[in-house]
Amino acid sequence: MASMTDQQAEARAFLSEEMIAEFKAAFDMFDADGGGDISTKELGTVMRMLGQNPTKEELDAIIEEVDEDGSGTIDFEEFLVMMVRQMKEDAKGKSEEELANCFRIFDKNADGFIDIEELGEILRATGEHVTEEDIEDLMKDSDKNNDGRIDFDEFLKMMEGVQ
């Protein structure tokens, strides 16, 4: 086996032994000739089998990134890097979806913004002792375009600091 790149070592560190074994089993099913690589065509099938759902565009972009030598094939280490990337993307998408749901709940009047009254309600609902000054400070810090309310992008930025 060729020496691992930093990316490949990172990918292995991110995954449990069980996951690596599961990915290897799926990979091997499509490595028909046992040569240690699969064609880019088979890649989508393998990823779907492992619960990933890349679009055609995502697949093309992934393949372009991963198939550095342009051989049209991907070896197992390249495959691991790609799967980890995809898993992280999916996780990011999920947390953004959860935050969108929170935003909708916090945006009581459904105008697409969280105003200072709504922000105050949210903070008081946590049970923490919150002063008007605390609420105003958070609004000031979060309201990047200074329109007196928090839009969804500002909310995402605000929540990045929380997680």
Curated annotation (Swiss-Prot):
GO cellular component, one term: troponin complex
CDD domains according to UniProt: EFh (cd00051)
Coiled-coil region: none
Keyword RNA-binding listed: no
An example Gene Ontology molecular-function term: calcium ion binding
GO BP: skeletal muscle contraction
Origin superkingdom: Eukaryota
Gene3D superfamilies in the record: EF-hand
Entry's family note: Belongs to the troponin C family.
Described function: Troponin is the central regulatory protein of striated muscle contraction. Tn consists of three components: Tn-I which is the inhibitor of actomyosin ATPase, Tn-T which contains the binding site for tropomyosin and Tn-C. The binding of calcium to Tn-C abolishes the inhibitory action of Tn on actin filaments.
Stated name of the protein: Troponin C, skeletal muscle
Source species: Gallus gallus (Chicken)
